[in-house]
């Protein structure tokens, strides 16, 4: 689509680098996904709240999407602030481009680094299967955010982490550094003081 628009959003060398990271990441995902789900099912036995008996199924799903996003916000913010986690996450910010391919530029050990954060979800009583499915769906929205093709999305900008909001997160402009950590929702950034609207042209840049 970008080629049809005659936009230079992709570079061959950059995309091949992304593919290399993606292969390693997927190997780890395949190796750990089942184990992580089994671990969550085990933890679910010790749940603090029996949410399934307290709310209807649709509300359990809604809670899963919201709480997954909150935990991701915390994980993502710490990945920019804690040296060990940044060493894992920084590969995602190593591109000078902003395109769909960058969404797949994921660290090999990223899936493992998330485990200590997301284990809280089954412990508070969220069904592990629902958490797994809702998490996968949320990840798909995260892919959509890595593009320059989509401009602003009207009223959705108020509560969703839209592509324009996520371009800020990848921007090299000083006021954009370490902003907009949300994945599905932008409300956490607004609540916790890390929100920055997209007012200037964002220039993606690799970070040390």
Regions found by a protein language model. Give the residues of each.
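Membrane-interface helix-loop junction between the first two transmembrane segments
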Residues: 1-16
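Short, low-complexity, polar/charged sequence segments that are solvent-exposed and flexible
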Residues: 15, 41, 107-108, 187, ...
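Residue-level signal for inorganic ion chemistry
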Residues: 19
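Membrane-embedded catalytic scaffold of the fatty acid hydroxylase/desaturase
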Residues: 23-32, 55-200
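Long, highly hydrophobic alpha-helical transmembrane signal-anchor segments
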Residues: 31-56
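Conserved small/polar residues in nucleotide/adenosyl-binding loops
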Residues: 201-208
């Amino acid at each position: 689509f970008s080629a049809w628009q005659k936009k230079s959003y992709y570079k061959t060398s950059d995309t091949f680098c992304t593919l290399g990271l993606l292969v390693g990441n997927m190997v780890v995902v395949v190796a750990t996904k089942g184990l992580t789900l089994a671990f969550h099912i085990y933890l679910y036995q010790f749940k603090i709240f029996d949410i399934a008996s307290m709310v209807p199924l649709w509300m359990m799903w809604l809670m899963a999407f919201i709480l997954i996003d909150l935990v991701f916000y915390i994980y993502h913010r710490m990945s920019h602030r804690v040296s060990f986690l940044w060493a894992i996450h920084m590969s995602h910010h190593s591109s000078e481009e902003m395109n769909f391919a960058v969404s797949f530029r994921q660290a090999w050990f990223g899936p493992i680094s998330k485990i200590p954060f997301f284990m809280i979800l089954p412990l508070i009583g969220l069904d592990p299967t629902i958490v797994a499915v809702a998490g996968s769906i949320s990840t798909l929205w995260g892919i959509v955010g890595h593009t320059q093709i989509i401009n602003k999305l009207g009223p959705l900008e108020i509560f969703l982490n839209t592509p324009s909001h996520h371009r800020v997160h990848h921007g090299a402009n000083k006021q954009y550094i370490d902003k907009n950590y949300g994945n599905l929702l932008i409300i956490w950034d607004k609540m916790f003081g890390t929100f920055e609207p997209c007012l200037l042209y964002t220039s993606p840049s690799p970070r040390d």
